[in-house]
Amino acid sequence: MAEYKDNLLGEANSFLEVLEQVSHLAPLDKPVLIIGERGTGKELIASRLHYLSSRWQGPFISLNCAALNENLLDSELFGHEAGAFTGAQKRHPGRFERADGGTLFLDELATAPMMVQEKLLRVIEYGELERVGGSQPLQVNVRLVCATNADLPAMVNEGTFRADLLDRLAFDVVQLPPLRERESDIMLMAEYFAIQMCREIKLPLFPGFTERARETLLNYRWPGNIRELKNVVERSVYRHGTSDYPLDDIIIDPFKRRPPEDAIAVSETTSLPTLPLDLREFQMQQEKELLQLSLQQGKYNQKRAAELLGLTYHQFRALLKKHQI
């Protein structure tokens, strides 16, 4: 249940509008279609629809249609009788039967083959199905909630998705905004995930993010949305370790080699200015930038930063005071 709460954090108007729409839809015993990119929390919205409905005491069953081939998907959704195919040694109740009295959530619906789509339509219209290898219709009472990021109307035009099924599923459509359109929620969730990770790895507290880290989090596009944000924050907190200084290094790509701590970008430190100039002012600015760079590469450990500049701790502290850093 913790992850359910994690992904439903948010104050952005677009997200609050979704929650309000879900609250209105939940009591209605109608199919719902959820549209959203990967990592936006489609299953969690489906779960919310279930637990705010009169079916909340019934089962909430989910299935990713993209995870199975046509035959396995058919069997997993509708069940099969013993001997229906090679290896079917006993009767297997499908997801619809297991969701009887509750809600069935089908993710990646657009990947379902036409044969399965036809059977889904029959369940929606008549509330009945037949197991694979069976001949007796079974009555089921299930609310169907489906999700995809595909353009289903375009697929209908291409002939790869049934128009009548889309008509029945789209009683109402919930469109989840991507994280990049919820900028005000990024830091809210990042801080929450960071605190949770600190608890998981037994750290006493989370020291917060530096301004540079905040800019990194806010400027990134987040193609993986909330799921990616959670992974990135947890990874960064773990790598940050037990330092009491604010987290500065946001590790978005774990495969990218980190530069040595003592590496200094030549382009940033050795480029010569154009003349004429105020030499003292230039020296002051260079000194300040080197202090900031040493703090960054020393993970905001002032003793380590002083060592990087060949200074004593007290000399380094005096320079920080001089430049009001």
Swiss-Prot record:
The Sigma-54 factor interaction domain extends over 15-237
Q: Which residues bind DNA?
A: 302-321
CDD domains registered for this protein in UniProt: AAA
What is the predominant subcellular site recorded for this chain? cytoplasm
Q: Where does ATP bind?
A: 36-43, 99-108
In the UniProt record, which is one GO cellular component term?
cytoplasm
By what means is the activity of this protein regulated? ATPase activity is inhibited by interaction with PspA. Under inducing conditions, the interaction is disrupted, allowing activation of psp transcription.
Q: Which UniProt keywords apply?
A: Activator, ATP-binding, Cytoplasm, DNA-binding, Nucleotide-binding, Transcription, Transcription regulation, Two-component regulatory system
Q: Does the record bear Transcription regulation in its keywords?
A: yes
Write out the function statement from the record.
Transcriptional activator for the phage shock protein (psp) operon (pspABCDE) and pspG gene.
PANTHER family referenced in this protein's UniProt entry, alphabetically: PSP OPERON TRANSCRIPTIONAL ACTIVATOR (PTHR32071:SF38), TRANSCRIPTIONAL REGULATORY PROTEIN (PTHR32071)
Q: How does it assemble?
A: Forms a complex with PspA, which is composed of around 6 PspF subunits and 6 PspA subunits.
Q: Which NCBIfam families match?
A: phageshock_pspF, PRK11608.1
Full protein name:
Psp operon transcriptional activator
UniProt source species: Escherichia coli (strain K12)
Gene name of the record? pspF
